[in-house]
Amino acid sequence: AYADAEALLINNDFDGAIEEFKKISGYKDADERALEAYYQKADSLQSAGNDKAAAIAFGQSDGYKDSRERSITLWNTIAEHPTLAAGRRHTVGIRSDGTVAAVGGNNDGQCETSAFSDIIAVAAGNFHTVGLRADGTVVSCGKTTNKQCDVSSWENIVSIAASGNHTVGLKIDGTVLATGSNVCGQLNVSSWSDIVAISSNISHTVGLTASGKVVAVGSNNDEQLQVSVWENIIAIAAGTRHTVGLKADGTVVAVGNNADGQCDVSDWTDIVAIAAGTNFTVGLKSDGTVIATSVPK
């Protein structure tokens, strides 16, 4: 089995080699050779220009050689790092020195960010604030009723999302962590893999894979999770009861509640970025103009 695994690696069948080495974990240096296979796979993917998949593969190399450094370098070019975020009644922003300013409602301590440092991204839930540090750890403050602030043990995080009463973190290896309220199943992300972007709202969580597919968990009362047929997606956004995806060709797809026309995006073109709110969707066009679905007064 060991010889078979080595032969697969020599022939650049990286996935096959990884699988075979894992089958004989503990034998000789099989575990280290599996990491070498991950590393060579990542190097090959990066050489081919597939930076998203390469970032994940380097992350799966578990610190082997310079894999963590190479993964972080790639993630810094592909991961979203919002410097501003708004919760239900508060707003937070990253200062140039990596500290965080916050204003607004503070009944639950969601604005008590004075201890935050080395922050590269922020996210805000209804009554809590989350910060991603440059070293991949996460800090938080605010309401803890649903354990939405239980992130102190998280590490190797490259992107964060927060909404309602839950918090989501994307790891360097493309897996996802989540904590907080799970009343609708919005935390059920443990089986996700190859994720390159995350988005969440009150009752659902969405993930974008390196292959351009989309996964979603949580409430499906308005069919906001019906994203399995989407392809060639490069960005995602979760509204309160709808989900939006930006395609590689600049068009946009949306599913979920459409009572206010928030999913009426089929005629949008030349879009380079998207956002979703309670009952509306916004798109940034390549010429710098902004388009939005109508919201009744």
Model-derived features with residue positions:
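Conserved core positions of repeat-based scaffolds
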Residues: 90-93, 102, 128-131, 140, ...
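Short solvent-exposed coil/turn linkers within tandem alpha-helical repeat scaffolds
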Residues: 20-33, 58-70
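Beta-strand-rich domains and repeat architectures in extracellular enzymes and scaffolds
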Residues: 81-93
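Alpha-helical tetratricopeptide repeat
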Residues: 1-9, 32-46
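Short glycine/serine- and acidic-residue-enriched loop/turn motifs that recur at repeat junctions
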Residues: 89, 104-115, 127, 142-153, ...
